[in-house]
Amino acid sequence: MSLLARLEQSVHENGGLIVSCQPVPGSPMDKPEIVAAMAQAAASAGAVAVRIEGIENLRTVRPHLSVPIIGIIKRDLTGSPVRITPYLQDVDALAQAGADIIAFDASFRSRPVDIDSLLTRIRLHGLLAMADCSTVNEGISCHQKGIEFIGTTLSGYTGPITPVEPDLAMVTQLSHAGCRVIAEGRYNTPALAANAIEHGAWAVTVGSAITRIEHICQWFSHAVKR
């Protein structure tokens, strides 16, 4: 059975929760062994896949995990707003470190490497691809290229103001277009995650609400202030 078929079966049997194990950069939790522990805990609690940033984190997580790993590398570039897996060598490094699925910024913004070249390199390694998109048009374009997973990852993050609520309308439109949608971005409660599934998402990625202790503590701290 192919990886995609196994993942489809897992989503059908266990639900579509993907956990993004990305600690706050530079925080006490930002250590590969802690990321690996997070990933194992997420998988033991029902996550069908995890999303891991960085080669050292991925190498540390891989031996301890049987569920698929979505691998990314984040970079801050001077000549492009694209941050997620912008280079071909990033794809190579993620593949060598054990990623099953490679996600990359698929927005229609200026970029060092075009989407087709990134996809070709992912296919060269025999891996699945996830397009992190900011608009419906981007998602449909990537779906037409044969990219397996279309994420709403960048919706609300390419403009000056980030909305509070997730983009459920984007989920619905991409689902109606036939995409295998991974809802991602501001799904910080179980109710919002359930709403994404109700709106047609194939799976939902949750990050901060599960793995970023600083964010969660701030939510509670602000709530109890007098």
From Swiss-Prot:
Biological or metabolic pathway of the protein: Amino-sugar metabolism; N-acetylneuraminate degradation; D-fructose 6-phosphate from N-acetylneuraminate: step 3/5
CDD domains, A to Z: NanE (cd04729)
Entry superkingdom: Bacteria
Enzyme Commission number(s) of this protein: 5.1.3.9
Keyword Isomerase: yes
Keyword Isomerase: yes
Gene3D superfamilies the UniProt entry points to: Aldolase class I
Catalyzed reaction equations: an N-acyl-D-glucosamine 6-phosphate = an N-acyl-D-mannosamine 6-phosphate
GO cellular component: cytosol
GO process annotations (BP): carbohydrate metabolic process; N-acetylmannosamine catabolic process; N-acetylneuraminate catabolic process
Keyword annotations of the record: Carbohydrate metabolism, Isomerase
Gene Ontology MF, one: N-acylglucosamine-6-phosphate 2-epimerase activity
PANTHER family linked to this entry: N-ACETYLMANNOSAMINE-6-PHOSPHATE 2-EPIMERASE-RELATED
HAMAP family the record matches: ManNAc6P_epimer
Protein name as annotated: Putative N-acetylmannosamine-6-phosphate 2-epimerase
UniProt organism field: Salmonella typhi
Gene that encodes it: nanE
